[in-house]
Every structure is written in structure tokens, then in C-alpha cells.
Amino acid sequence: MASGAARWLVLAPVRSGALRSGPSLRKDGDVSAAWSGSGRSLVPSRSVIVTRSGAILPKPVKMSFGLLRVFSIVIPFLYVGTLISKNFAALLEEHDIFVPEDDDDDD
């Protein structure tokens, strides 16, 4: 479930057309927003901010991350992490690799 959500968050801008494969020249002479080409990075960047005539291009599409999206990712991963650490600590204690002692309060 979590990997599907992460995949959706990564691919959402690609499907919506927010990321393009480099600067392209439109029919009217405007240069579109660019993606840092050649597949090196998934982070969108904008190399051209003005048209040939000097007009400033509109703001790029902003992908908002609401609190619901953040918590829907953070809380499941925190829960899975605590389950893994709890089970690993029980495994270590079961095999006598690490057994906590209460004798540390002798100071």
C-alpha cells in the first residue's frame, strides 16, 4: 500500500504533464517550462523563464502536499518501523545476544 502511494506521488506530475523532456519551442515562438533533461533527475527545474519576446512565463504547476497526504505516509511508516524494531529486539533477547540488565543503577 505504501509503495503504491509513493509511486502515485512520484508519477502524478509526470501524468499531468508538469514535467517535460526539455525546453521545447511552441508554434507561437514561446519556450515552454523545462525538465532537467537526459533522465538525470526527477526534480523538475525550469531553465527558461522568459519567451523570445521578453515576456515572463506563467508560474509552473505547483504540487501541493496537504497535511492529510503527509500524515497518510508518515504514520504507516512509523507504525511499520516500530513493529520491525520491536520484533528485532525480541529476537535478540530470545537468542541471548542482547539482554538488558537492571544492574546499571549501582552508581
UniProtKB/Swiss-Prot annotation:
GO terms for biological process: calcium import into the mitochondrion; cellular response to calcium ion starvation; mitochondrial calcium ion homeostasis; mitochondrial calcium ion transmembrane transport. It is found in: Mitochondrion inner membrane. One of its GO terms (cellular component) is uniplex complex. A motif (GXXXX[G/A/S]) lies at residues 81-85. Its main location: mitochondrion. Residues 54-65 are mitochondrial matrix. Pfam families: DDDD. This is Essential MCU regulator, mitochondrial. It comes from Homo sapiens. The lineage of its organism: Eukaryota, Metazoa, Chordata, Craniata, Vertebrata.
